[in-house]
Amino acid sequence: MLMSTKETLGYTILATDGEIGQVSDFLVDDQFKLRYLVIDTGKWLPGKKVALSTAWISSVDPHKQVVVMNIERKRIQEGPEYSEEHVLDREYETRLHAHYQYPPYWM
């Protein structure tokens, strides 16, 4: 089933051990491939946004508007913050993948 990214803005994001926030944006690479969800951690970690790879999604329920990530809350809490002012370059991606202990998509 294909869905517009507009439809998924605001979807609730669940870690393996609880809610972490909502989808607030998407990041695509220079080949226009969707690589990351930007998550607004809202009430849980006020003011913090994080980028999580679409490869780390374990399931999506469009009826409940929920995306389940294959990551624990503590790891997200300790992870690199994302901001619109920050250039999403290979150095940032390398740190991101190393922190979450997932292999980078470019290797």
Feature map (PLM): residue ranges:
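Peripheral interaction segments used for macromolecular assembly
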Residues: 1-107
